[in-house]
């Protein structure tokens, strides 16, 4: 009875049974909410309705499985970038963290003391909150970035020659 209901010819009625949850039976027609078990987490079974904490694995990180309930660190891929998925490849406005300080993630709202690195000192990201000594470069030395903490020799330019930067 199990083979007839869980085989390659899965019927819609018998596919949701608990005794039918096997990796070999995880097909598109057999992947249901009642069949989302860890043993059923294979790439061919990754569907939105199966995105649960027990089924969110590295082999189940597909674009169709990118829902908020399935966004776990092991599923952090470029196709699954959510606020709870802060990784370098997931650099978004809600993902400004120390582990996300990459050139592709340099946003004005990401200019924080923890994310202000030489790789993040671009002209368009020269905001006052990002003025740090390690960001004092020729491309980041502007009038809005002339702070005492940014007064180093390599950053001293004519347009930074103000009283606070002398």
From Swiss-Prot:
Subunit comment: Interacts with hair keratins.
Tissue distribution: Expressed in the hair follicles.
Role summary: In the hair cortex, hair keratin intermediate filaments are embedded in an interfilamentous matrix, consisting of hair keratin-associated proteins (KRTAP), which are essential for the formation of a rigid and resistant hair shaft through their extensive disulfide bond cross-linking with abundant cysteine residues of hair keratins. The matrix proteins include the high-sulfur and high-glycine-tyrosine keratins.
Gene Ontology cellular component annotations, sorted alphabetically: cytosol; keratin filament
Residue ranges, annotated region (26 X 5 AA repeats of C-C-[GRQVCH]-[SPT]-[VSTQR]): 5-154
Keywords linked to the UniProt accession: Keratin, Repeat
Disulfide bonds: none
Species of the source: Homo sapiens (Human)
Family, as annotated: Belongs to the KRTAP type 4 family.
Sequence repeats: 5-9, 20-24, 30-34, 35-39, 40-44, 45-49, 50-54, 55-59, 60-64, 65-69, 70-74, 75-79, 80-84, 85-89, 90-94, 95-99, 100-104, 105-109, 110-114, 115-119, 120-124, 130-134, 135-139, 140-144, 145-149, 150-154
Protein name in the entry: Keratin-associated protein 4-4
């Amino acid at each position: 009875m199990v083979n007839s209901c869980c085989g390659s010819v899965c019927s819609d009625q018998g596919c949701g049974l608990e005794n039918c949850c096997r990796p070999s039976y995880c097909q598109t027609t057999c992947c249901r909410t009642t069949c989302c078990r860890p043993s059923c987490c294979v790439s061919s079974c990754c569907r939105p309705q199966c995105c649960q904490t027990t089924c969110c694995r590295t082999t189940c990180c597909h674009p169709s499985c990118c829902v908020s309930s399935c966004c776990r660190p092991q599923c952090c891929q470029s196709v699954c970038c959510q606020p709870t998925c802060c990784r370098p490849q997931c650099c978004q406005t809600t993902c400004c963290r120390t582990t996300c300080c990459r050139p592709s993630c340099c946003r004005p709202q990401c200019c924080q003391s923890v994310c202000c690195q030489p790789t993040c000192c671009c002209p368009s990201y020269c905001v006052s909150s990002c003025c740090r000594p390690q960001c004092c470069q020729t491309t980041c030395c502007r009038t809005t970035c002339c702070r005492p903490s940014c007064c180093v020799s390599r950053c001293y330019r004519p347009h930074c020659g103000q009283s606070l930067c002398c």
